[in-house]
Amino acid sequence: MKATDLRQQTTEELNGKVGSWKEELFNLRFQLATGQLENPARIREVRKSIARAKTVLRERELGINNA
């Protein structure tokens, strides 16, 4: 998900998405360890999505306005 899309969501929605992405990341890592992971690139995508969402949340916390 792009940062511009994330900036349009509320803080509660972002926190919910981060939680669900963390859960998905846990499951992906578990699948990787057991050899059942079909798409290893998904781990990277989820990690980056978490980072983007946390960045947007931190920007709001600091009052930074990035369009």
From Swiss-Prot:
InterPro entries: Ribosomal_protein_uL29 (IPR050063), Ribosomal_uL29 (IPR001854), Ribosomal_uL29_CS (IPR018254), Ribosomal_uL29_sf (IPR036049)
Single GO term (MF): structural constituent of ribosome
Domain of life: Bacteria
Family: Belongs to the universal ribosomal protein uL29 family.
GO-annotated biological processes: translation
PANTHER family named among the record's database cross-references: 60S RIBOSOMAL PROTEIN L35/50S RIBOSOMAL PROTEIN L29, LARGE RIBOSOMAL SUBUNIT PROTEIN UL29C
UniProt protein name: Large ribosomal subunit protein uL29
Gene: rpmC
GO cellular component: cytosolic large ribosomal subunit
Lineage: Bacteria, Bacillati, Bacillota, Bacilli, Bacillales
Swiss-Prot/TrEMBL keywords: Ribonucleoprotein, Ribosomal protein
PROSITE patterns from the UniProt entry: RIBOSOMAL_L29
The keyword Ribosomal protein is assigned to this record: yes
